[in-house]
Regions:
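Short, ordered loop/turn segments at secondary-structure junctions
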Residues: 36, 105-109, 138-139, 165
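Active-site-lining helix/loop region of Rossmann-like oxidoreductase modules
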Residues: 5-6, 10-14, 150-218
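Short, hinge-like loop/turn segments at secondary-structure boundaries
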Residues: 48-52, 120-122, 151-153, 178-180
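A short hydrophobic/small-residue beta-strand
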Residues: 100-101
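Adenosine-phosphate binding glycine-rich loop
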Residues: 129-158, 165
Length: 218
């Protein structure tokens, strides 16, 4: 492909600052950006990235369909929320316009077990319009692979212990809410902590009913 890859950014919060910068650094062309925050709508994406003017204005998310039709990006990077239910609209509008899409949404890494109905619907939509919808998700698999590789070279393992820590302030509101930031102890236990006591069968039953939100396990 001799021309530049055309990219749209859906969601212009904290993570998009890095995502859009990566797009520009790698020589792609940023052609559209969408968000729901009235404080940044209408501004050049440079106000989020912190660079010289790019010439691309942040548009309201509800105008994505028309703008995707007009700009015809090759791919859309979605960085909004953490569950498939929350991502369904963004994925759908991309698929209907034959735009490939990838999301940072944790659940989108492999949503077939946790949100089967939504995933089947989006899968059919993507196939109908000849595009790909996928997720990068949180790299749990990456951390597990590191440990697996190290364990493979060991003759005897007594115990494996690992931890991951980060400041949720560095990420968006979705991650903060998924971790229970701002909740009282009682609210945290009710909304998040109680899920840790569920059996795999109980979780499976809730998933089938559409009542279980994967990010509640955080």
């Amino acid at each position: 492909m001799k021309r530049k890859v055309r990219v749209a950014q859906y969601g212009c919060g904290k993570m998009s600052k890095y995502l859009m910068q990566y797009v520009l650094d790698k020589g792609a062309e940023l052609v559209a950006a969408f968000d729901m925050n009235p404080e940044i709508i209408g501004k050049d994406v440079s106000s989020v990235i912190g660079c010289d003017p790019v010439g691309v204005k942040i548009s309201p998310a509800d105008e994505a369909d028309a703008i995707l039709k007009a700009t015809k990006p090759d791919v859309c990077v979605i960085a909004t929320r953490s569950t498939m239910a929350e991502l369904k609209e963004a994925f759908s509008v991309c698929a209907k316009n034959s735009v490939n899409a990838i999301s940072t949404c944790e659940e989108s890494l492999y949503p077939w077990n946790s949100s089967p109905d939504i995933t089947k619907e989006l899968d059919a939509l993507a196939k109908e319009h000849g595009c790909t919808l996928c997720g990068s998700g949180y790299p749990d698999l990456f951390w597990g692979t590191m440990i697996t590789n190290l364990a493979a070279s060991s003759a005897h393992i007594t115990k494996i212990k690992g931890s991951s820590s980060y400041n949720v302030e560095d990420y968006g509101i979705a991650l903060a809410q998924g971790h229970g930031a701002g909740l009282t102890l009682d609210e945290f236990e009710k909304q998040i902590g109680n899920y840790n006591s569920l059996s795999s069968d109980e979780i499976g039953s809730l998933v089938e009913k559409g009542e279980y939100i994967p990010s509640d396990r955080k």
